[in-house]
Each structure stands twice: as structure tokens, then as C-alpha cells.
Amino acid sequence: MAEFVWEDPLMLEDQLSEEERQIRDAARDFAQGELAPLIVDWNRREFFDPEIMKEFGKLGFLGATLPDYGCAGISNVSYGLIAREMERVDTCFRSAMGVQTGLVMAPIHMYGSDEQKERYLPGMRDGKIIGCMGLTEPSHGSDAAGMQTRAKKVDGGYKLTGTKQWITNSPLAQVALVWAKNEEGEVGGYLLERDAEGLDMPTIEGKMAVRASSTGFIHMDEVFCPDENKLPGVKSMRGPLS
């Protein structure tokens, strides 16, 4: 019987390709060398430096599984290994990277127009544009069926009203992908620019955990979203749950 290896109980190491090991090792070197020395201070101060997103971008971590728009196009396994190394230091790094990649870039890539993809994905890939995703609400958590945020059709676009809470990256984000229901009850994705009138994305302060994560609200008071900023490829629960 083979000796049990406590560090690798599922024998994952034996199942990885050489490329996957190289990606994992590069992520580990960066996380341990560059991020680990920062986290105690950041956790004490409830601080996250957005410049780290540009470092993620240089390493190809943002949108890493997307096959185009200059993204790395790596496997889901490889991306999971990167995420594990970020999480090994602190969940704030994995959260910031994961929200940008999986909750903002991926829906834009899947459901967005060509113009939306060209406008947002290259900048988000490089960490020059930070995104957040608004689903969770104060009264219903992440239960999309109970969503109260509304998108009312007006000339040239929509007006969004509602509040999203516990939103990773919102205090730093230049763009928010907000999921809202229209007047027929259909769920759609709306891209809101930070400087939009009626939009406020303040920080949630005094957290007892995940303190180095930049977490906040998305408050919307009849925020105008032009037609061209609505994701055209989805109008159902499939969008936020993809």
C-alpha cells in the first residue's frame, strides 16, 4: 500500500500536466513572494491596493480562461490552481481576481455585444479597468428569484433603481455589471459606469473577516443605462447563474 501523503491526499500532483504544474508554480512564486508580505498589514487596515490588479493582468491571471481578446486561454484546471495559490495567502486576492474573471469578464464574453467586448475586455484583462458584479441584495441575499432591483425602460435605455450589498470590488470598480428585473420580470445584465448620475458604490467598513477585500454596496437611484450597455445575449436567470 502506498504511503499516505498528507500534503496531497487526493494525489492531485500526479494528475497534473507539465503545463499545469508550471502555471501553478508561477502563481505560487508570485503569491508567496509578492502578496504574502502584504496581507497582515492590509488585513489590519482593511486595505486593498488596486494596483495589484495590474500585476494580475501582467501575469495573465485576469480572464485567464477566455480564448480571445488577448486573454491566456488556459484550462479551467490551470485557473483553479492559480486561484488556490491566491487563496493560500488570503481570500481577498482570490476574490478580486475571481470576480473580475468569472463574474464580470465571463458574462460580457458570453452575452455581450462585440462593441461591449471590445470596450471592456482588453482593459479588464490588463487590470486597468476593474469590474464588479451586482447580484446580492440586502433583503434576499444572492437569491435571484427574490431580486428587487428594477430596470425601467425609457427612451434610449433603462433606469435602474435598487441596492446591491456585499459586492466585491465595488469601491474600486470603474464598471458594474448589475443584474436587474425589467417590467416583465425578466432578469437582464446592465453595465453601469461609475460616474453615472444616481450611482453610489461606497465601502462596507468594520468587517470581522475578509478585511483586506474591497467590499461595498451598489446604490442606484434611477441610474440611466443606455441601450448599448445592456447585455443583449441573455434575459433570464441563466445570466447571473452562469
Task: List the predicted regions and their residue ranges.
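Glycine-rich beta->alpha junctions and the first turn(s) of the following alpha-helix
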Residues: L12-I23, D200-S242
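Long, well-ordered alpha-helical segments
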Residues: A27-Q32, E85, G112-R119, D155-T161, ...
